[in-house]
Amino acid sequence: MAIRPVYRPTIVKKRTKKFIRHQSDRYSKLKRNWRKPKGIDNRVRRRFKGQYLMPNIGYGSNKKTRHMLPTGFRKVLVHNVKELEVLMMQNRKFCAEIAHGGSSKKRKSIVERAQQLSIRVTYASARLRSQENE
């Protein structure tokens, strides 16, 4: 049976569109990633009507749902089986995410131990070889 979170609130984002960099649509050398405009005459910095919006604190998510996955869990990065034991009592609030640097052998042991402790693992099947391929 799948582990369910204690409660699963509706996650409301105040803004889902990305904030894009001023004039990134005009010049290909300017990437779309947000950079704060610093120019003395810049229209975006001066918040003129019809210009791109700048990110600010008002766009922040609700404190209760911040960093929450759509499943209702929060992620905790796990490097080995010992770090997984910390989540044993909190398995209805947090789920484990296996760190990128772990080998497939270590990943396999973490997934097995998580199943014993009934801890959910995000993307548990990644980099696990099936029996046919071995």
Curated annotation (Swiss-Prot):
InterPro entries: Ribosomal_eL32, Ribosomal_eL32_CS, Ribosomal_eL32_sf. GO terms for molecular function: structural constituent of ribosome. GO terms for biological process: translation. Signal peptide: none annotated. PROSITE patterns: RIBOSOMAL_L32E. Keywords: Ribonucleoprotein, Ribosomal protein. CDD domains: Ribosomal_L32_L32e. GO terms for cellular component: cytosolic large ribosomal subunit. PANTHER family: 60S RIBOSOMAL PROTEIN L32 AND DNA-DIRECTED RNA POLYMERASE II, SUBUNIT N, RIBOSOMAL PROTEIN L32. Belongs to the eukaryotic ribosomal protein eL32 family. This is Large ribosomal subunit protein eL32. It comes from Apis mellifera. The gene is RpL32.
